[in-house]
Amino acid sequence: GQCGNQIGSKFWEVVCDEHGIDPTGRYVGNSDLQLERVNVYYNEASCGRFVPRAILMDLEPGTMDSVRTGPYGQIFRPDNFVFGQSGAGNNWAKGHYTEGAELIDSVLDVVRKEAENCDCLQGFQVCHSLGGGTGSGMGTLLISKIREEYPDRMMLTFSVFPSPKVSDTVVEPYNATLSVHQLVENADECMVLDNEALYDICFRTLKLTTPSFGDLNHLISATMSGVTCCLRFPGQLNSDLRKLAVNLIPFPRLHFFMVGFAPLTSRGSQQYRALTVPELTQQMWDSKNMMCAADPRHGRYLTASAMFRGKMSTKEVDEQMINVQNKNSSYFVEWIPNNVKSSVCDIAPRGLSMASTFIGNSTSIQEMFRRVSEQFTAMFRRKAFLHWYTGEGMDEMEFTEAESNMNDLVSEYQQYQDATADEEGEYEDEEEEEPEHGYE
C-alpha cells in the first residue's frame, strides 16, 4: 500500500547507502565488509549490478509510479512492481477479499520467483500500515498466503498503527482490528510503529517545526536498518530474525514489539558527535524514544533486545545493559531471568560513530490495542460504516471475532504484567508486602 511502499523504498535507500550501492545498482563503496554479505538483501545480476530482493505491491499505481521515478527507482526489478488500478478505498474488505484477492496470485508468482532465487531463505519482511485498505487488507492476505506456502520461514512485519490523534480515515479502527486479528495468528514478529509517536520524536527530540512523512520515514528506516544490520554485516555478536524471535517471544501470541533508535539526530544535523555507550543506552531505553504511542513505564518488559553498531567494547555494552536492568528492576518481569539480550555489529550507520536499536516486548503495548479497540466498539455498537464491508461480502461475525481476539490479546498482556514469580495464587498475598528479593 502507500505507506508500506514509501517506508520500504526509504529503507532501500538507507541499505543501498550502507552497502555502497548507487541508484543504478553498481557497487561504488570502499570496504570489503560492504560486499561480504550483500547477497542477503541483493541479487547479483549478470552484469555485476545488484538488484534488491524486494517486491512492491499496491492496488493503485500512484505510489509505485513515484517510487519508480524517485532517486532509487531504477534499481528495482521492473517485474517486481505489482499493482492494480482500482484502489482499496481504505476498505479492508476490498484489500482482503475482493480487489486484493484478484491481484494476490500475481504477487505470489513474484514471491515464488524471488524465493527460488535464495540459497537459504530465512524469511519475509513486510512493511504496511493497518489503517488503510491495501496495506491492512491485502497485506494480511499476503501474509496468510505466504504463511501457507512457507510455514517454517520467519514472517517479520513493520506495521504502522493508526495514531490516537493523527487520523486519516474514519474507519481506521475497523481496518486495524481486522488486521491485528490476522497478525496475531500469522506473523512471527511485528514491529509496532505509529505516526503520532514519530511526530512527537520529530518535534521534541529533533526540533523539527513541520515534520513531513519523509522525516517520519527517515526515522523508521533508521530502525529497520538497525534491526537488520546483523544480517547484513559481520559482527562480534550476531543475531538473525530467528534468534531474535526466540529471545523475544515468551508466548506465541505476544509478538508485538516496540522499537527505538539512538542517537536521534535530525536529517540535516547528523554531525559526528562523540557518543558513548552509556549515552546510547540511556537514550535507547527512554520512553520518549519509542516509535509507538505506548509508554513502557505503564507496563513491564517481558523481554528486550538491543543491537549496538560501531566500534565499542562488548564488555561495556553488557555492563550498561545490566545496569539498566538493576536500576529499573520493577519494569522487568522477575519470572524471566536475563531477559535482555544484546548484539553488536561492527559497522555503524553512515555519519555516526555508533548507534543502537532497541526492540522491546513490553506489556504496555496493550495501550495501543486498547485504544483501537475502544474506537472500534464505539462505531461497531452503532454498526456505523459497516455496509462498506458487508457490501464486499463480509459478515458481521468476522468483526465480532476480530474484536474479541484483540480484547483477548489485551487481557493476555495484562495477565503477564500482573503475574509474579510465585506459582499459583496461594502466596501472592504475602508476596506483595515483602520487598522484592535480590534488589536490596
Swiss-Prot record:
Disulfide cysteine pairs (residue numbers): none
Subunit structure: Dimer of alpha and beta chains. A typical microtubule is a hollow water-filled tube with an outer diameter of 25 nm and an inner diameter of 15 nM. Alpha-beta heterodimers associate head-to-tail to form protofilaments running lengthwise along the microtubule wall with the beta-tubulin subunit facing the microtubule plus end conferring a structural polarity. Microtubules usually have 13 protofilaments but different protofilament numbers can be found in some organisms and specialized cells.
UniProt GO molecular function: GTP binding; GTPase activity; metal ion binding; structural constituent of cytoskeleton
Family named by the database record: Belongs to the tubulin family.
Gene Ontology biological process terms from the UniProt entry: microtubule-based process
Pfam families per record: Tubulin, Tubulin_C
Composition bias, Acidic residues: 420-440
Residues bound to GTP: 2, 60, 129, 133-135, 195, 217
Keywords tagged on the record: Cytoplasm, Cytoskeleton, GTP-binding, Magnesium, Metal-binding, Microtubule, Nucleotide-binding
Domain of life: Eukaryota
Membrane-traversing stretches: none
Signal peptide annotation: none
Cofactor: Mg(2+)
Positions with a binding annotation for Mg(2+): 60
Primary residence: cytoplasm
Gene field: TUBB3
Region Disordered: start-end pairs: 411-440
Protein name: Tubulin beta-3 chain
